[in-house]
Amino acid sequence: MVWKRLGALVVFPLQMIYLVVKAAVGLVLPAKLRDLSRENVLITGGGRGIGRQLAREFAERGARKIVLWGRTEKCLKETTEEIRQMGTECHYFICDVGNREEVYQTAKAVREKVGDITILVNNAAVVHGKSLMDSDDDALPKSQHINTLGQFWTTKAFLPRMLELQNGHIVCLNSVLALSAIPGAIDYCTSKASAFAFMESLTLGLLDCPGVSATTVLPFHTSTEMFQGMRVRFPNLFPPLKPETVARRTVEAVQLNQALLLLPWTMHALIILKSILPQAALEEIHKFSGTYTCINTFKGRT
């Protein structure tokens, strides 16, 4: 038993070195992308913004069917027609992911009309842009239900069948604010941190589930109407991401079976800095970069 444990202690660091080298090689050499021609994709919040761009990207890359969920029928109709004109079968369903029973009922309707969903993209989110003291007590549960609990419910609705088929992928469009919160968006930051923990736990839980994987995407501020008015101090140094870029990189991450994607890549430095710098230094970074007050000019869509 002792020799077995000693052997494991020797093998483990060698395993780590191998995996790091393998990942480094993967950054240099082009990897084979997953074929999407047999995949049925469901995107929550699919009517506009990043959701609409995701639908376009999946269609361009050959997804078999695309299903859109959202609360605004006009936007869903427009996106559905656009995807159909691209030659991809597309359907939309009115569904508030913050309503548990509505999620389960709509998921059943999707299975009956479209078939099994093999790629679920949890993209729907809301932001109120208020500090704790200014926030509406009735609005706070809404952000938690849509941004966090909605992912619990959609995943519970579709994951069991993915496990049966041994084919599935759960995607979470999160935010870098899950790792580094800002004042003035306390409800959004809290819900995104919860969603990040949910996906981290889910990803580890799927390790022994063949054919089923998960991807968490953490983008920087994206230029959509949802965060309209948000400003940082040096916009040329920290420009907002384009939704097309976020969508393209997200679908690529799915095709590469990448568990975690930070956008842009410089956001990896954020994790390192938070691990080594004292709190006072981190506070100065927030003030210097303008993230401390960036939400003051917020006038986006809630």
UniProtKB/Swiss-Prot annotation:
SUPFAM superfamilies: NAD(P)-binding Rossmann-fold domains (SSF51735). CDD domains: 17beta-HSDXI-like_SDR_c. Its EC number is 1.1.1.300. It is found in: Membrane. One of its GO terms (biological process) is regulation of retinoic acid receptor signaling pathway. The keyword Transmembrane applies. SMART domains: PKS_KR. The chain crosses the membrane at residues 9-29, 170-190, 195-215, 253-273. In the retina, expressed in cone but not rod outer segments. The keyword Repeat does not apply. The active site is at residue 188. Substrate binds at residue 175. It is a multi-pass membrane protein. One of its GO terms (cellular component) is lipid droplet. It catalyses: all-trans-retinol + NADP(+) = all-trans-retinal + NADPH + H(+). Disulfide bonds: none annotated. Belongs to the short-chain dehydrogenases/reductases (SDR) family. This is Short-chain dehydrogenase/reductase 3. It comes from Bos taurus (Bovine). The lineage of its organism: Eukaryota, Metazoa, Chordata, Craniata, Vertebrata. The gene is DHRS3.
